[in-house]
Amino acid sequence: MSGGSQVHIFWGAPVAPLKMTVSQDTASLMSVADPWKKIHLLYSQHSLYLKDEKQHKNLENYEVPESVGSPDFSGHFLANCMNRHVHVKDDFVRSVSETQNIESQNIHSSRLSDITSSNMQICGFKSTVPHLTEEEKYQKLLSENKIIDEQPKHQSDICGQNFNTNLFQLGHKCAAMLDLVCSTEQINIGPEVVQRECVSTEYHEIQNQCLGLFSSNAVDKSRSEAAVRKASDLKISTDTEFLSIITSSQVAFLAQKKDKGRSPINKGNVNMETEPKASYREIRIPEENSIQLDGFTEAYEGGQNQAYSLELFSPVCRKTENSRIHINSDKGLEEHIGSQELFNSEDKLPPNEIHIELCSSGILCSQLNTFHKSAIKRSCTSEDKVGQSEALSRVLQVAKKMKLISNGGDSAVEMDRRNVSEFKGIKKTSLIKNCDSKSQKYNCLVMVLSPCHVKEINIKFGPNSGSKVPLATVTVIDQSETKKKVFLWRTAAFWAFTVFLGDIILLTDVVIREDQWVGETVLQSTFSSQLLNLGSYSSIQPEEYSSVVSDVVLQDLLAYVSSKHSYLRDLPPRQPQRVNSIDFVELEHLQPDVLVHAVLRVVDFTILTEAVYSYRGQKQKKVMLTVEQAQDQHYVLVLWGPGAAWYPQLQRKKGYIWEFKYLFVQRNYTLENLELHTTPWSSCECLFNDDIRAITFKAKFQKSAPSFVKIPDLATHLEDKCSGVVLIQAQISELAFPITAAQKIALNAHSSLKSIFSSLPNIVYTGCAKCGLELETDENRIYKQCFSCLPFTMKKIYYRPALMTVVDGRHDVCIRVESKLIEKILLNISADCLNRVIVPSSEITYGMVVADLFHSLLAVSAEPCVLKIQSLFVLDENSYPLQQDFSLLDFYSDIVKHGADARL
């Protein structure tokens, strides 16, 4: 027995670090009572034993996948071994299925010598294992767990790092185990860097990050660094943010399930259809419109498929080129749960679509299977790398058979009037305390105690490096007085947006999993899981759900909640929002998680080039608008999906008044403010000045405008010689555009329309897109770079700044006008659009429109304008003006028509 290979495995690590790794920061930490435990894993040609210090025990009742031919030892060896079983106390029962007819492959002698000469302790695996409880709200810090695996001298035994008690394989000379427990690559776990030798790191990495999300951070030398790291971990990708908005807005529609007969939405499903033609004032989204997501690389798109849980998240080693992973779904998932076996057969790939619909029993969340059944054969080669850009998960089919209709001025969403979906009743449910078998799926009727936000797990190594896996946890309880956490993985994580405190939910096809790090068991979603939200505790009538679940079980749950959680009765009932009665709101009265209409003035635009998400199979940048209803009270409106196509039109009409419909209000927990987001049902309309909605908006907007010095005319202002911000009413007589020190272009009432049009190329220039500095050209007519803005090298066309001469009676002054205000005077027509035609079938260009605007503005018969200017007077001791300077701050061309006094 002593001649066989030995693997020494230590488990039961204390909370506090070992003495050899203790620093001053961890000196005060308490260690646990349980000491280290030591067993000897002895392996020979025909047997496998786990030898404790006092007794021998055998493993049983577990199976593992067939070994994938390990390349870790030289020589060919044909192993014909029988299954050996070992029992170990303290829940250390794991499967070991020795491989049959598995040929070990040759390896290079250099690697063999490296392995056999590793006569040292491997102490590098320092995993930050935080544990946060629900009551502490992710704030209490625990110490690090240090797992140290030893290897005695004068032996060629391979030490195991990060021993995974859920899955390991044994072949000749522990070859298969080496694929899981040994490593050659680096993994960042918390602040430490450890050395590993296998590419199958994604499972351990995701597991550690999962603990980091649902636990507090470990003690670090710098608390501030830990806080920064925690804040960065909570940040989600733009893809997840996009899908969160889509899901939350969908839930806002479906929240009116209690009014099945009266609601205009009888089936509110994320997958909707669009009719081919659009009538007046209707906005339709194309049928091929689909929202695809890159961020959720779930391995099944590239053929690297797991069963349903994170514990089967076992990526393939790149070095084992002959290994293939297949999953057989024909035998049913029930046969695969207890074993960790990967079958070589055809597979119907697991579903990865969010599907939310209104059924007769409540809001049903499920996952749609969009993949057809096909044979999956995956070779672990470099061609099979599934990156974040390749794992496009079709999550939503947006806007099929859905339209916005304007009927008598009131917009409502008219959707398919089919009968609501029926949810097949599940009479057999299990209490949480009875969910103890890992080889069985359970249906649980529970109450939600605490939902949470969707988080993400970053995959840093392996074939799926760079991708992210969404994760949410919901704490539930039932009449057995057992509280459990439910882990919702991947697309199921977005179901967390459909549940609230006190909701009664039915979870189907969930499995039990043991979190070996935290030491608790959790419920976990599978690819076939569904979630049915019956509603809040206070609004449920058991007889209404007799066709779904047993009324006895439901009554018992309600009775338990009433006696043990009576505080839920005092929660105000959620008021479902009526789609046909969505109101126009004022921004200062916004409420989160509702759909609203709003009339807004667009102030500015921001495009986040690094915030990219997938929409209709393409990368799309996040577009944010700055809008206002009151002077200088700005809010954020984010354009998602189809709404991003509005950006060019909104940019051309910057400063105009727009009507937006079906916006979703969500709280930004980073900035602690409310933001508006477009939905697949949103629409926008630019309002003309004579529109009653625009007139009403201006009346409210002008009341909120700050008070200016009221000046009746220009002469009075020049006589008072007061510096400050003033409003004056005057007529524009000339616009002069300096080109060089000795050359300028002057436009006035005597300029013809033709001469103005021919002058347009000279009143624009090409400058730095960041600072606006005019760029010179070299001898090859190539623009030079703006050195002050490097490495930013983008260019943009601007209007030249001008000197505006205004006249009021016998007095005239010159006012400096910046490039942005020239663009505003020209109805926000950008300088780079002058050569574009307005519509493809027309020959009229934007340059012609700009020339006509200049000609009308400078005409003798032109109406006077109201100008907001900044005036500066420098006076001597006799109040004689030594210097006077005027700068234009804003321009109001139509305010005189409605009365300048209203503005003042």
Curated annotation (Swiss-Prot):
GO biological process, one term: DNA repair
Domain of life from the UniProt record: Eukaryota
Places the protein is found: Chromosome
Location of region: Sufficient for interaction with SHLD3 and MAD2L2: 1-60
Region annotated Mediates interaction with SHLD1, chain positions: 721-891
Gene Ontology cellular-component terms listed: nucleus; site of double-strand break
Record region (Interaction with ASTE1): 1-568
Keyword tags: Chromosome, DNA damage, DNA repair
Alphabetical list of InterPro entries matching this protein: FAM35A, SHLD2_C, SHLD2_OB1, SHLD2_OB2
Keyword DNA damage: yes
Any one Pfam family match given in the protein's UniProt record, by short name: OB_SHLD2_2nd
Function, in words: Component of the shieldin complex, which plays an important role in repair of DNA double-stranded breaks (DSBs). During G1 and S phase of the cell cycle, the complex functions downstream of TP53BP1 to promote non-homologous end joining (NHEJ) and suppress DNA end resection. Mediates various NHEJ-dependent processes including immunoglobulin class-switch recombination, and fusion of unprotected telomeres.
Entry's family note: Belongs to the SHLD2 family.
Assembly behavior: Component of the shieldin complex, consisting of SHLD1, SHLD2, SHLD3 and MAD2L2/REV7. Within the complex, SHLD2 forms a scaffold which interacts with a SHLD3-MAD2L2 subcomplex via its N-terminus, and with SHLD1 via its C-terminus. Interacts with TP53BP1. Interacts with RIF1. Interacts with ASTE1.
Name recorded for this polypeptide: Shieldin complex subunit 2
Lineage of source species: Eukaryota, Metazoa, Chordata, Craniata, Vertebrata
Gene that specifies this protein: SHLD2
